[in-house]
Design a protein with these regions (language model features):
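Metallocofactor- and cofactor-centric catalytic cores in central/energy metabolism, strongly enriched
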Residues: 1-171, 175-254
C-alpha cells in the first residue's frame, strides 16, 4: 500500500523476564513493514526508552506524552507485542496520550522449536492481558483476525492496510461537514438520519436547497474548462457507452 497520508502511533510492548532480543528484532521488523506500506510512524526511539519499547510506568508516560504532542497527526495506534509485554504500560500509554483514535492490538506468534527461555515470546497470552487491561481502562480497540500474526506475512500487511483505511475514515469524518441536498423523498424512509447522533460524533449536517444546486448547474457553460475536465474524469471513471453527451455533461456539472 503506497499511501503516505496515514500516520500511526506505534506502541511496542516489553516484559523484563522475557527475551529482550525479540523486542529489538520485532520492533525493527514492524517498522520495516510500516515503511513498506507507506505509513508514517510516531514512536519512541531506542534512545528514549529501553529498546524503544514500553514496560515501566515512566516509559508509558513518555510514550503517551509523545503521542499527545502529535495529536493532530496520529490517526490510529498500533500496539505490537514481540514478547508477552506489560499490559499496564500499554494501557497507561493510551491513557496518558488522551487519544481517541482506532487502536489495533497485534501479537507475534511463537515458533515450534523456539519455546525455551531464550526464544519464547508468549505474546499469545500477553495479548489477552493487554486487551483485558485496555478494557478496564475504557479504551476501545480492535483485533487482528488471527490471534497472532507474523509481521512478515501477507496476512499482516492486509490487516495493516485495512486498519490504516479505517483510521483515515475515522479521522476524515471527525469534524466533517456533510451537505444534505434537498428534502428526503417521502417514500424513502431508508435515507433518514439523526443530525444529533451525527453531531455527537463531530459530524455536522448542512442542508442545501436543491434549487440552489440546479441554479448553479444551469449557470455553467458546456465549454467551461472545469466542466470539460470533469467530463473527461467521468469518462475515465466508467464506460459511458451510448450515454448521450448531454447526460454526461449534466453529471459533470453536478
Amino acid at each position: 500500500m503506497a499511501n503516505g497520508k496515514t500516520t500511526l502511533g506505534l506502541v511496542v510492548g516489553n516484559r523484563g523476564f522475557f527475551p529482550d532480543h525479540l523486542v529489538e528484532s520485532g520492533r525493527k521488523q514492524v517498522l520495516e513493514v510500516l515503511e513498506k506500506a507507506g505509513i508514517k510512524v510516531v514512536c519512541l526511539s531506542t534512545s528514549d526508552t529501553k529498546l524503544g519499547a514500553v514496560e515501566t510506568r515512566e516509559e508509558a508516560e513518555k510514550c503517551g506524552r509523545l503521542f499527545r504532542e502529535h495529536t493532530d497527526e496520529i490517526q490510529g495506534v498500533l500496539v505490537t507485542l514481540p514478547n508477552f509485554g506489560d499490559e499496564r504500560a500499554v494501557a497507561q500509554t493510551m491513557r496518558v496520550s488522551k487519544l481517541d483514535v482506532p487502536v489495533l492490538v497485534h501479537a507475534f506468534p511463537d515458533e515450534k522449536g523456539k519455546m525455551g527461555l531464550v526464544d519464547r515470546r508468549d505474546s499469545f497470552c500477553g495479548k489477552m492481558s493487554a486487551c483485558n487491561c485496555l478494557t478496564q481502562y475504557g479504551i476501545r480497540y480492535s483485533l487482528t483476525d488471527s490471534h497472532t500474526v507474523d509481521p512478515g506475512s501477507d496476512e499482516f500487511l492486509a490487516e495493516l492496510e485495512q486498519f490504516a483505511a479505517v483510521s483515515r475514515v475515522v479521522s476524515g469524518l471527525r469534524g466533517a461537514t456533510i451537505g444534505a441536498i434537498g428534502t428526503r423523498p417521502p417514500a424513502f424512509d431508508t435515507v433518514r438520519c439523526s443530525e444529533k447522533i451525527l453531531e455527537a460524533s463531530g459530524i455536522s449536517l448542512e442542508p442545501v436547497d436543491l434549487s440552489e444546486i440546479l441554479f448553479a448547474v444551469h449557470a455553467l457553460k458546456d465549454d467551461d474548462d472545469r466542466v470539460k475536465a470533469r467530463v473527461d474524469a467521468v469518462k475515465a471513471y466508467f464506460a459511458v457507452c451510448d450515454a448521450p453527451i448531454e447526460a454526461v455533461t449534466k453529471i459533470a456539472k453536478l
